[in-house]
Amino acid sequence: MNYFRGLNTVTLAFFISGLSVFCSAQDDHTILLYTFATGTGKVVKDLSGKGNNGKFAGEKLSWGKGKFDGGLVFGGNGPRDHIVVPDSESLWLKDGLTVEMWVYLNFWSTAGGTGETKEKSYKVGPQSAGRTVLRLTTDEKDWGNAALTSNTDIPTKSWHHLAGTYDTKSGQAKVYLDGKLDGKIKIGGTIISNNDMLWLGRGQGPFLDGRMDEVRISNIARTEDEIRTLMDQGIEGVLAVSPKRKLTSTWGYLKVRR
């Protein structure tokens, strides 16, 4: 009996110490986290704890099938579908940036990025040449001269994971396609923030024609391993379940085993 009690205690302690692994999708650096799992209403719930909820805009934006579960369906330039996220201080990036998302493109965009856009501050998403663009304004380079385009076209009619990162300390910008590095350059400087709203599914002019799922924005440059983990497991998979529910269910299991 003492052996099992000791084993249970060790197992529980190990589990508690591992909560940070389960919750890595939602850490102190996560400023926006969308699973699109609600599937109702006209508001997208932010799971980051920062309160950056999004609102539907456009004529036909709707819930639909995503990569993992629910997602959003965007109708392109005609209906001008997009998500509007009101400005907040948590969206004012300075030291770093990571934007991650799943997209399903019906067609390539007609101009610059239609993924995430905070105009004249930072954007990451598909662009008209069929590739991923990352664009910034820093205190060393302006919006027109601080851009990185991926090396590989994003295939249409299938789901693909896009990510872009920027680290102020190194000045390095990187873009990823399906978890693999697909381009990098040195931009340099600190990201310049502004009080513009943040958009999903549009740029200054073009609008996404396709679907979107699982968006995470962070205020640091995440590693390739972190990006790949979220891509492979999905937000729900990385979170597993909330720590409180996980602890309760695991402790109940251990008590049965005693």
Language-model segments: residues:
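Extracytoplasmic low-complexity segments
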Residues: 2-5, 15-78, 183, 228-258
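Extracellular glycan-recognition modules
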Residues: 27-31, 40-44, 52, 77-138, ...
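Short, exposed beta-strand/loop patches in secreted or surface proteins that constitute
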Residues: 59-66, 123-127, 189-191
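Flexible glycan-contacting loops in extracellular carbohydrate-active proteins
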Residues: 68, 184-211
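Beta-strand-rich interaction surfaces with strong enrichment in secreted/lumenal proteins
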Residues: 87-89, 149-153, 187-188
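Short beta-strand and strand-turn-strand segments in soluble, beta-rich domains
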Residues: 142-145
